[in-house]
Regions:
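Conserved "right-hand" nucleotidyltransferase catalytic core of DNA-directed polymerases
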Residues: 1-158, 168, 172-174, 181-184, ...
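Feature representing long, continuous alpha-helical segments
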Residues: 161, 185-186, 190, 206-210, ...
Length: 237
């Protein structure tokens, strides 16, 4: 009664596909390439030498041995010193190189995973990208998407939002975005009767930011979007 009627709907959605503004994606790819080259030059200047920015080993040599940035217990891993995102976020207030590498990684992922890949995935006959909607994969009953994953298009940051603008409607039509506001946690507040949760929602405060402030403290002010994203994962876990 629930899943079977949806099969035809999803099949039609997959067949119809999603229209893309290829000119916009191509211009974004060029812009990202320009910004990456500029960032690369700045990173080399900060480091005082050229190195492979994509190599964790070479980056750790620069950060922890050449620049003598502090390495915490969390930083130490079996094969050396970690340069994972959370480590670079901790180092960013101490040296601009760490922040520049974070930005470089974000832009490089946008270019390789989205602008360049989506262009290649457009069907030449339909001019659209055709994803697969997985109806019975997730434990929660939500849909997932693959080949490509159109449910994971970036929304954070200036360039991420520009990638989303490449998804366009047919002429004379509009794309509609509708979403419940933190519906799962509102239900949790109602069913549990938790006074703090209820108060946060009654005062129309952002539950994810409230969690971020309690968990991450001052780091929230430095990386509000990233800290909110992590707090959201914590809340739903």
């Amino acid at each position: 009664e629930i899943e079977r009627p949806l099969i035809e709907v999803l099949a039609a959605m997959e067949l119809w596909g999603v229209k893309l503004d290829l000119d916009l994606l191509k211009s974004l790819s060029v812009e990202l390439d320009r910004r990456l080259k500029k960032l690369e030059k700045q990173i080399y200047e900060m480091a005082g030498q050229e190195f492979n920015i994509n190599s964790p080993t070479q980056l750790s040599q620069i950060l922890f041995y050449k620049l003598n940035l502090p390495a915490s217990k969390k930083t130490r891993i079996n094969k050396g010193l970690s340069t994972a995102t959370d480590i670079l976020e901790e180092l960013a207030p101490l040296n601009p190189l760490a922040g520049a590498v974070l930005e470089y990684r974000q832009l490089a992922k946008l270019k390789s995973t989205y602008t360049d890949s989506l262009i290649k995935l457009v069907n030449p006959e339909t001019g659209r990208v055709h994803t697969s909607y997985n109806q019975t994969i997730t434990a929660t009953g939500r849909l997932s998407s693959s080949d490509p994953n159109l449910q994971n298009i970036p929304i954070r940051g200036e360039m991420g939002k520009k990638v989303r603008q490449a998804f366009i409607p047919e002429k004379g039509h509009e794309l509609l975005s509708a979403d419940y506001s933190q519906i799962e946690l509102r239900l949790l507040a109602h069913l549990s009767g938790d006074p703090l949760l209820r108060q946060i929602f009654l005062e129309d405060r952002d539950i994810h930011m409230e969690t971020a402030r309690r968990v991450f403290g001052e780091a929230v002010e430095l990386f509000p979007e990233e800290m909110r994203r992590r707090a959201k994962i914590i809340n739903f876990s």
